[in-house]
Amino acid sequence: MTDASTTSRPLFNRQQLISLFLPLVAEQALSISIGLADTLMVSSVGEAAVSGVSLVDSFNVLMIQLLSALATGGAVVASQYIGHREPKRAKASAAQIMFIMISLSVVTAVIVAVGRHAILRGIFGSIDADVMRYAETYFLLSALSYPFIGVYNAGAALFRAQGNSKISMLSSLVMNVVNIGGNAILIYGFGLGVMGAATASLVSRMIACFTVMFLLQKPDCALRIDHLTDLKPDLDLIKRILKVGIPAGIENGMFQIGKLSVSSLTSTLGTAAIAANAVAGNISSFLNVPASAVGIGALTVVGQCLGAGEKVQAKRYSRLLLLTAYAGDWLMNLSGLFFLNKLALSWFNLSPDAYGMALELMVWFNAVSLILWPSSFTLPNILRAAGDAAFTMTVSVISMWVFRVAFCYLMVLRFHCGLLFIWMGMFLDWAMRSLFFCVRFVRGRWMEQKVI
């Protein structure tokens, strides 16, 4: 490898970085906006249908997060092999992440499809018969889509590992357009309700999966899988992928479970608080799109630098990416603070109480995000790109459960505080994450990890 004290020519020029990150910003924004549109269309079916879908979606988000984390492990390994100029090992790692994703998602799909009733009862307890009926229908078709989600996530991650984020953006665009169009036809046109929504989602995920796989097999693709025999397990590569993927999966899973635990507190605070929390949460998702996109792209940039042995470049690009994330975060949140918050809230039919609570939450969110969001969520992706996933997992899980979940339960149940203190718990979690991640980054221990 190249000596850590020397650097060759820059591995990424300005145009390459722009070409990588702009499609990621578009993809993230598209994903959030289409998700909102999807929810609005399903809501026309009725309250029981919305309840059934929302229950299943809480499980689906957990599954997608786990699959995405495993794809991250594959992307880190492939990126480092690309940077180290080992194309055969890079291709082999691509095949292994496909093997892992297909195996896990198919097994999970079978378990969920067969045991969906028991799973719903076990997680959510006794629910109304109508809600259960809608939930089981949606859960079955969601389970059938897991293998397609898994393969799509793996393919998109592998394209990003090569520095190509346009493929995942275009695939996401196609998937979401098909999903919305399918919803419109099947829900409004044929009156299929929840089954129509689930079918549209399944078909859109199938199309996205097949599109990514087709493009991954093109002759000019550096990570194409030439033969089905390439998918046979390679224990050494699987171990390297899981070294990053398993901690990231545990981190994402525990984070999602923690969020669900905290969200249950909101339901005890009344209808206005529930509405304010939901609307403020949706709007805030848009504000962090640029910083989130930088974090995803960091897996490619930092991973390839470290694979090439360019530790100096890895640190320089990391600082540049973190600065870029802060610039995007400041642009979005200052815009929110001065005018976007009120504009966005006006799109929702909120009561005066809910509007006031939502606006208060957004102002606090804007102010705290300016300081803490990129160091809490963009920076750990830089550490993961170096293979430091076990550290980010440990910090994130402890911070979530000690500083967010425990704090929120204490403030709401013991001291009878309101919705703002649930968000204060979230901000406290961010502060703790930022502290530990920044110390880790400055000390440089993250660059001592060995992935390949």
Segments the model singles out, each with a brief description of its role:
Residues M1-L24, A78-S145, G189-I246, V302-S369, ...:
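Short alpha-helical transmembrane segments in multi-pass integral membrane proteins
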Residues R14-S33, A37, F59-L66, L144, ...:
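Residue-level signal for short hydrophobic patches within transmembrane helices
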Residues S19-G35, L141, M175, S204-A208, ...:
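Transmembrane helical elements of multi-pass membrane transporters/channels
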Residues A29-S51, L120-A129, I185-V194, G253-F286, ...:
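Helix-terminus/linker motif at the lipid-water interface of multi-pass membrane proteins
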Residues E47-S58, A135, F139, A198, ...:
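Small-residue hotspots at the loop-to-helix junctions and early N-terminal turns
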Residues V50-V110, I149-S168, I274-L340, W373-S396:
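Small-residue-rich hydrophobic transmembrane alpha-helices
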Residues L62-Q65, N179-N183, C209-M213, F286-V289, ...:
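Hydrophobic transmembrane alpha-helices of multi-pass small-molecule transporters
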Residues A71, L141-R160, S168-N176, A197-V212, ...:
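Short runs within selected transmembrane alpha-helices of multi-pass transporters and secretion channels
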